[in-house]
């Protein structure tokens, strides 16, 4: 959900900028239907400085829904003013033209950065390293609906790590750390399995020099915020029951078959 919210915010600001509109973040009955609890609903504000947000929001305005999971060029070009956008909007194309502003909005809060810098110092700097790899494994909800969002096999991570430096630490970020602690693939001292919350995990991802992402908007954003092109991603995003993910892919990243 965190990554999905980030796409929704970035696309809203991107469309507003392209059209010369003001924008705001939803906070009301419609957004309550999207997020299970208040913590999820306001996680963007818990994580980021969000310098570009506005407070005014009209729940009574009509809803404008994206046409499909693909980038909706017609919506981007012709979106009317004073509407509530509804959809996933999972493409950089919605906000590439204001990348600088989105990066400023998604700058982590100082309290978040402080803890992450302390962890980085302990795992990387104090051990004599200057670089690290961020690796994300998404499992729990993907195990429930594998034909929609399949869990990536360990072979994907093996191949991805084989393409990156072999003598630097690897942060392992996962929603199932107990599984990772028990898996022989992660037994080496090279791996540090994070048990932080997802805000601090994404912050640490953004500090990594190389990123191996899962088929997940969470690690997509962690890699995007890192701001480098040394990102390895799976070609497989959805299973046979899923959507067409073509526009979520970024050309400058490297993609592996699964």
Predicted regions and their residues:
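Secretory-pathway luminal glycosyltransferase catalytic domains
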Residues: 28-166
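N-terminal pre-catalytic "stem/leader" segment of glycosyltransferase-like enzymes
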Residues: 1-28, 32
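Aromatic-acidic/polar surface patches that form glycan- and anion
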Residues: 1-5, 149-153, 197, 204, ...
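A structural signal for isolated positions on well-ordered beta-strands in alpha/beta enzyme cores
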Residues: 22-24, 134, 169-171
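Short, aromatic/basic amphipathic alpha-helical patches
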Residues: 34-52, 179-188, 243-249
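Short, solvent-exposed loop/turn segments at secondary-structure junctions
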Residues: 1-3, 28-33, 89-92, 138-142, ...
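Donor-binding and catalytic core of enzymes assembling or modifying cell-surface/extracellular glycoconjugates
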Residues: 164-234, 239-247
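Leloir-type glycosyltransferase catalytic cores
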Residues: 80, 115, 240-258
């Amino acid at each position: 959900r965190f990554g999905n919210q980030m796409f929704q915010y970035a696309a809203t600001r991107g469309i507003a900028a392209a059209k010369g509109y003001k924008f705001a973040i939803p906070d009301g009955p419609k957004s309550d239907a999207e997020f299970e609890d208040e913590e999820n609903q306001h996680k963007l504000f818990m994580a980021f400085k969000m310098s570009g947000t506005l407070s005014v929001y009209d729940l009574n305005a009509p809803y404008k829904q994206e046409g499909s999971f693909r980038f909706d060029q017609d919506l981007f070009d012709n979106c009317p003013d004073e509407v509530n956008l509804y959809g996933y909007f999972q493409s950089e194309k919605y906000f590439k033209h204001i990348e600088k502003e989105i990066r400023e909005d998604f700058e982590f809060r100082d309290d978040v950065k402080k803890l992450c810098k302390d962890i980085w110092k302990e795992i990387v700097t104090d051990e004599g390293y200057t670089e690290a790899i961020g690796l994300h494994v998404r499992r729990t909800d993907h195990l429930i609906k594998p034909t929609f969002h399949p869990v990536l096999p360990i072979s994907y991570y093996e191949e991805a790590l084989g393409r990156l430096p072999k003598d630097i630490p690897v942060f392992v970020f996962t929603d199932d750390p107990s599984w990772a602690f028990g898996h022989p693939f992660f037994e080496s001292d090279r791996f540090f399995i994070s048990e932080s919350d997802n805000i601090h995990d994404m912050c640490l991802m953004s500090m990594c020099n190389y990123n191996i992402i899962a088929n997940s908007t969470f690690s997509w954003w962690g890699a995007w915020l890192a701001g480098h092109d040394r990102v390895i991603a799976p070609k497989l995003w959805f299973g046979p029951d899923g959507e067409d993910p073509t526009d979520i892919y970024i050309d400058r990243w490297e993609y592996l078959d699964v």
